[in-house]
C-alpha cells in the first residue's frame, strides 16, 4: 500500500481543499503527516489503556468506579452555606484542575455527612468525563477483596496491581475499621506504589490529623504531602437530614 505522505497524493489533496481546511489541517509536510499519524496512534493507545484499566478495576469489585449514590455529584450542585464549605469547594476544584494535567494527593477530614464524598465524587466524575480511570472505595471493601483473593488461592498481588493502576484512587472511611497492623501495612503498600508511580491518592476520613497519623503511620502521611498534597477540614454539621432521593413509581 502506498504511503500518501510520499506519493504526492497529500499535495493534491491540499490543492483541492478549501483554504479554511488548509488553515485547520494539523500537518503541511510529509514529515508532519507521519508525526501526526504517530501522535494519533499514541493517543488512541493511551485511551484504550485507560478504558482497560477502568474496566479491570471495576471487574474486581463488581461495580462502577463511583457508587450510584454519588454519580450525579458535581461542583455545580454542591450546596454552600458557610465559608468552610466555600473553601472546601475551592480546594476540590483546584485539586481537579491539577489532576487534569498531573497528579496530587488529598485528605478530606470531617464528621459523617459533611460532603466529603460529594466533592471527592465530583472530582472523580470530572476526570471520568475526560476518559480518566477512577475508583472510590472504602478501606473495608479493599480489605475484604484482598482477603477474598487469598481465600480463593490467588495472590493479592494482581488485586493490588489493578488497584494501583487507575488514574485516581480515593480511599473512603479510612480509620473506621481500626484494623491496626494489617490495615496499616495495606495502606502503606497502596500509597507507596501509587506515589512512586506518580498516581494520585485521596483519603476520606472522620479522624483528625493526629489520629490519622497514629493509624496510618508517619510514612503514609508524609507521602500524602507529595505533589502539593492537601488536607481539607469539613468541620460543620451533617447535611444528610436534608437529602431525599425520590424513586420513580412504575
Q: Where in this protein do the model-derived segments appear?
A:
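A short, basic N-terminal segment
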Residues: 1-86, 231-232, 236, 242-250
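Pre-Walker A (pre-P-loop) alpha-helix and adjacent loop at the N terminus of AAA/AAA+ ATPase modules
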Residues: 66, 79-106
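Short glycine-rich substrate-engagement loop in P-loop NTPases that contacts/grips substrate
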Residues: 84-92, 103, 128-165, 184
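Conserved catalytic network of the ASCE P-loop NTPase/AAA+ motor domain
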Residues: 98-101, 128, 161-164, 192-197, ...
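Walker A/P-loop nucleotide-binding motif
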Residues: 102-121
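Loop/turn-to-beta-strand initiation segments
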Residues: 104, 132-133, 165-169, 197-203, ...
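P-loop NTPase Walker A phosphate-binding motif
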Residues: 118-132
